[in-house]
Every structure is written in structure tokens, then in C-alpha cells.
Amino acid sequence: MPDRTEKHSTMPDSPVDVKTQSRLTPPAMPPPPTTQGAPRTSSFTPTTLTNGTSHSPTALNGAPSPPNGFSNGPSSSSSSSLANQQLPPACGARQLSKLKRFLTTLQQFGNDISPEIGERVRTLVLGLVNSTLTIEEFHSKLQEATNFPLRPFVIPFLKANLPLLQRELLHCARLAKQNPAQYLAQHEQLLLDASTTSPVDSSELLLDVNENGKRRTPDRTKENGFDREPLHSEHPSKRPCTISPGQRYSPNNGLSYQPNGLPHPTPPPPQHYRLDDMAIAHHYRDSYRHPSHRDLRDRNRPMGLHGTRQEEMIDHRLTDREWAEEWKHLDHLLNCIMDMVEKTRRSLTVLRRCQEADREELNYWIRRYSDAEDLKKGGSSSSSHSRQQSPVNPDPVALDAHREFLHRPASGYVPEEIWKKAEEAVNEVKRQAMTELQKAVSEAERKAHDMITTERAKMERTVAEAKRQAAEDALAVINQQEDSSESCWNCGRKASETCSGCNTARYCGSFCQHKDWEKHHHICGQTLQAPQQGDTPAVSSSVTPSSGAGSPMDTPPAATPRSTTPGTPSTIETTPR
């Protein structure tokens, strides 16, 4: 009894209170350990929760620090020196157990979201224990992976207790003659084994982010829920989860305390509300749930400090309600999808039936039209046949009406009419394309013909000019040869022989004389025609024409002599041979 009377005069979670709890609390859920010195506050900034409350900075191993609104003195030191404080062996074991439960809960929470996120969380946890990640990096990467921010007490808790786990890992690795990374890779189940530790509810570690659509773990409410209510009714000083941040401000409860013993500051007016704060909107669940959160809180109010711990235990059931809300939203979404599928199926059925009805009506009127044509051609037999198929007697007036109906465009959905219009449109496009193609081809042919005509005229002019120039050049050469007595009359080179018939033409050899004989024989020997009738001219053997061309005397003189007539006989006689 002296312990109980002393508890009313001490601070919350004082060493005396913690010693009392250590005797009553089972090993699965240990209370916060005792502190060995003055309260130490961390440098962690208080963070406003989603329901509008704030957590004040936590101290080492659950010792209370003055809240932000009630502190009269400054804080002592930063959280960097928390890991250097010596702890008793029993307290260290409890802190290691809490830290392992915390890491196991994080890993299982990631697995509940998805296997990929669970694997990423496991990698982050191993990196944190292996000292490859700092606590701040672990906090940011975990929030990025799960999209859930951790509660403000987590970083000071890790800074205070992670060195204990790392020292234990280093000690075990030295005993196994391995480095810590190898030992942790081989004995990972000792750190993240859910069967050896009792994991806490993930809602105690993570802030409420209902609007981002993340799910909560639905399968751990009984571990921290009403299954332990008889135990807590017998021992109200026991705490169901020593690292739970589930305390939330309530207007009916006044000042509440964090699970590690730190009182909350006076909160601002709430801006966000939990689902339990709006219990009136969820009457559909009250019939099969336990007594409401507000009733149990009013019942436990006379208990003082421990009533807040009972409220903390009740807060664990919030995940069940949120899980029900998620299922409700999912069920509503599935119902909407089913309604859309059903409406789409009905619409398709109606369209198919309309199409079939239109096709049957079209076939019916086609048969009526064919029967009417047969009636005109075949007579009474066709008339009786059409009367059997048609409910209306095929009189001439009705036939005219049916014919007009057939030629009138149908107002409903007629596949044949649509197909006919599509074919006509395609044919029209083809005709236009062919017309354009023919125009393009004819234009190209016309341009090519004009180009060919122009080029041909240019070519003809060029050829005519070349011929004229060649003729002028030939005449100039001939005239130059006739004027010169020293050049060959055929090729223009230096002449060495003279024609024996006229002693005028000069040649460079017998070849040129034979070549020029066709032109030269018309004028050769005209001046010596009278004297040459009596005697045969003596022709040099070197310049005798070929037999095929005939002798100069055998060839009759031309009627028209060349423009340059040889000189007089006296001149010819005097010309040296």
C-alpha cells in the first residue's frame, strides 16, 4: 500500500511508478524503463497530428519532460547524447524487446499494403540496423515507401534504443566471428520474426492519412483490443503497448499523456477529426461493436492517470472502424462497376434487338415487293401466294403503297441502306481520285510532249547549223585549194604531183587524185580537147587513174565547168611537169 499512496504524489511515469509496473506487467508488454538522471528532452520539434493535437518532445526511456505549454525551464541536452547513457541490464532488455516489436510491426505493415512495399520496408529496416542508413534517412525513405508519416515519438525512440540493438548485434557477430552485416543476413529472423514478439498496432506508429487511400492492417486489433480488457480491469496500472503513440486529445478528458509518460501540451482547436469523433455518422456499426469510445472514456475518468491508459487501449480499435470504412468504400465501388456493366449489357441487348427487328422488317417488305412483282407478272397464282405470306391483301393500291415505302429511305437503322450509302461514297471518292489522276497524267503528258517538241526543234536547228557550217568550211577549203598551186586539191597538204590531163590540178599523191577525180574529171582537159582528139595524152604512170573511174578522154566533158577554169594552152604548155 505505501507504493499506491506514493503514486498519487509523484509525477506521471516516475521511477516509483515504473517500478510498480515492472512487478505487475508481463514480459510481452513491458512498461517504459527507469531513467538514471535528470529528464532529457530531445531536439525533435513537436508535430501536429491529424486530429489537431501535438506531441511534445520525448525523453530517454520514457522519462517525462515538461510539455511545451507548462515548462518553466529550458531543456537540458540534444538527442545525440541519448545513446551514450548507461542503462541497467533489465531496462536494456525491455528496450530491445520494444525496438524489435517496433521494427517487426513496420515490416508487417508494409507487407499488408503490398509485397513490394513490404520488401522495401524490410530492406530499410536492415539498413537501419546495419548503420548504412541514418535515422533521418530511414524516416524519410519509410514515409516515401508507405506514404504514411511516422509519429513524432519514433525518431527520439530510435535514437535512444537503436544503439542498444546495434551493440547487441555487434556482440553476437563477434561471438560468431562475423561482421554485423553477415550475422544479420544469416539471422534476420531474430530481428523480424513476428512469432517471437508481439507486434503492436501499426496505427500507433503511423499518423492517420485516410485521405490518401492507404489501407490499415485489419488483423491485429485483437492483439491490442478488448481481448485484454479483463486484465486491465484487474491491474489498471498496466499498459497494453509501451511504445504506442495512440493518445489523442479529447475535450472531455482534459490533459492526456503519451505512452512514454510525456504529457501533451494544451492543443489548438481540432482541425481534423478521427472517425471515432464522428461516431454519430456510423450508427450502422454500433449494434455489433463494443461500447463506444466516449462511454468507456467517461467510465474511466475517475481513474485519473490510468484512465488515460485505458483510453489508449481503446484507441487501438480505430483501425477496425477504418477498415470497415475501407471495405464499405470498396463495396460501393464494386457495386457501381456492376451497375455500369449491367447497364452496358442492357444497352447492347436493346441495340441488337432493334437491329434484328429492323432486319426482319426489311426482309418482310422485300418479300412483299417481290410478291407484288410476281403478281403483276404471273397473275392469280402469284396473288394467292402473296396473300398467304402477307397479312394484308395485295390489292393494287396496297402494292403501290408498299412500293413507295420501299423506295422511301427508312428512318430506322437499316444496315443495307447504310452499306449502300457507304459504297456510293467510296465509289464517288474513287471517281474523283481517278479524275484527278487522269488530269494529272494528261497534264504531265502535255508538258512532256511540249518539252520533246522544243528539244527536237533545238536539235534540228543545231544540226542544220552544223551542216551549213560544214558546207561552208568545205567550200572554203576547196576554193583555197584551187587558188593555191602548191597545195593538194583533195586534202590541202603540200602538193608534189600534177594531173597529166590538164597539168593544172595538184595532188600530194595518187590516193588524193583518185579521191578528187569525181569532181576534177568535169574540167580536166577541156582546154586540150581539140589537140587530144588526134593523139592520146601521155599520162604519167604514177598518176594514171584507176580503171573503175575511166580515163579522162573517155569521160565526156561536163556542161558546166568548175568555177575556176585552168589557164590557156600556152600557159599549160609552159607549166613545168
Swiss-Prot record:
Arranged from A to Z, the UniProt key words for this protein are: DNA-binding, Metal-binding, Nucleus, Phosphoprotein, Repressor, Transcription, Transcription regulation, Zinc, Zinc-finger
One Pfam family it belongs to: zf-MYND
Annotated signal sequence is none
Q: From which organism does this entry originate?
A: Mus musculus (Mouse)
**Annotated positions of the Phosphoserine modification:** 14, 390
Entry's Gene Ontology cellular component terms = nucleus; transcription repressor complex
Q: What is this protein called?
A: Protein CBFA2T1
Subunit text: Homotetramer. Heterotetramer with CBFA2T2 and CBFA2T3. Interacts with TCF12, SIN3A, HDAC1, HDAC2, HDAC3, NCOR1 and NCOR2. Interacts with ATN1 (via its N-terminus); the interaction enhances the transcriptional repression.
Superkingdom in the source lineage: Eukaryota
- Composition skew (Low complexity), residue ranges: 68-87, 380-390, 536-553, 560-577
Chain spans, region Important for oligomerization? 310-356
Q: Where in the cell is it found?
A: Nucleus
Stretches assigned to the TAFH domain? 93-188
**Does the record's keyword annotation contain Nucleotide-binding?**
no
